[in-house]
Amino acid sequence: MTTAEAASTVHTSFILKVLWLDQNVAIAVDQIVGKGTSPLTSYFFWPRADAWQQLKDELEAKHWIAEADRINVLNQATEVINFWQDLKNQNKQISMAEAQGKFPEVVFSGSN
C-alpha cells in the first residue's frame, strides 16, 4: 500500500510508517500534506531503544498536534510493536506483506 492509499483509507492528518526488519522494528510519523506526505519524525527503533516513548516525546513536543491525533498514532504504534514483539517471543517470522495486511492503515517497508 502506498502512503497516499493509506492516507485515503484513514481520514487523518498523520500516518504511521514502519520499517519491518528481522531484528528490529522502526516507527516514524509523516504528516499528510495535500496529496502527499512530509516526514514529521525520524525513525525510532525497537527493541534497540524505547521507540514508543521516543515517539511519544517527539509528538508531545509538537504542541500543534491535537491530542486525539497523538493518541491515535501512539495506539497504532503500540499495536505494531506488540505484534512484532509477540512474534519474536514465539520465534516466529511474518512477512512484511502479512504485517501490512494486519495493519492496512500503516505504511510498511523493510527487508522481507
Curated annotation (Swiss-Prot):
Annotated Gene Ontology cellular component terms: ribonucleoprotein complex; ribosome
InterPro entries for this protein: PSRP-3/Ycf65_sf (IPR038447), Ribosomal_PSRP3/Ycf65 (IPR006924)
Keyword Transport (UniProt): no
Pfam families registered for this protein in UniProt: PSRP-3_Ycf65
Any one biological process term the GO annotation gives: translation
Keywords: Ribonucleoprotein, Ribosomal protein
GO molecular function, one term: structural constituent of ribosome
NCBIfam families: PRK02724.1
Subunit structure: Part of the 30S ribosomal subunit.
Role played: Probably a ribosomal protein or a ribosome-associated protein.
PANTHER family, per the entry: 30S RIBOSOMAL PROTEIN 3, CHLOROPLASTIC, OS04G0461100 PROTEIN
UniProt record similarity statement: Belongs to the chloroplast-specific ribosomal protein cS23 family.
Name of the protein: Probable small ribosomal subunit protein cS23
The species this protein was found in: Synechocystis sp. (strain ATCC 27184 / PCC 6803 / Kazusa)
